Amino acid sequence: MSKAACQSFIYGTAWKKEATTALVELAVRSGFRAVDTANQAKHYSEQLVGDALANLAACGISRDQLWLQTKFTPVDGQDHRLPYDPEADLGTQVKQSFASSLEHLRADYVDSYLLHGPYHYPALGAEDFEVWRAMEEIYKSGAAKSIGISNVNIQQMEMLVSRSAIKPMMVQNRCFANRCWDKAVRDFCRRHAIHYQGFSLLTANPQVLHHARIREIAGRCSVTPAQIIFRFAYQIGMIPLTGTTDEGHMKMDLGIFGFELSAEDMTFIENIDRS
């Protein structure tokens, strides 16, 4: 399987705590080949992801068969378990965090490295560009095969693309149906050949899962409402993330590649809950 194919559906590891190792192994054995984590002990157990990767490698699923993404998380998103010296300059913080990630993951490279969220809203500030320059250096070293940013708005994306030497290759955002599934950022990413990853597709949109029309489409396709949402995301060019802890749901999630939504259904879902 190519790295491009690996990346078509990502398994997210936030909030798995001590179950992280077993769940990552289960996800990969169920068919996932892309894993997302972060060097943020407050919400992720990156070292336990590394344990899972080591166990999988021992069973014949090697690192080069997997697509691995982690993140640099600014100090405001961390608890007391910081992976860097908070008194150091930001460039040093990025380097320390990245080195710690490679150690946790028992890897010599990652496929994608993200800034977990900007320091400033609604526009980027000096700190964001300082961090980005450090990430560019990691990319140029070959230790990160791509770099990107998460939790970002359209204004920030425009600034980053226009002012950076190395343009972002990945964006990861939470998607709300009532914001047209982050259409402004998605369209910007498409125009600039940036891969768009969508998370919280189900948890942020419970009203969509229970919508009568979604249930009707699911019945017609002989799938679940959750599969309809994930298939919609994939079909509009999004890379969906799931964090399910249920083996049956993992397999159902990967079943989205076995059917296709009509143009009419796609239009309905894209505009289902606009406010």
Residue locations for each model-derived region?
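N-terminal binding-site loop/beta-alpha segment at the start of enzyme catalytic domains
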Residues: 1-70, 134, 204
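Active-site groove signature of glycoside hydrolases
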Residues: 102-123
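Beta/alpha (TIM)-barrel catalytic core signal, keyed to glycine-rich beta->alpha loops juxtaposed to Asp/Glu
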Residues: 17, 117-275
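Short amphipathic alpha-helices and their capping/turn segments at secondary-structure boundaries
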Residues: 47-61, 94-105, 186
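Structural motif corresponding to the early beta-alpha repeats
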Residues: 64-91, 116
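Active-site mouth loops of central-metabolism enzymes
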Residues: 7-19, 80-92, 120-125
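A structural motif
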Residues: 32, 107-110, 144, 168
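Short, acidic/polar
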Residues: 16-28, 87-105, 155-158, 181
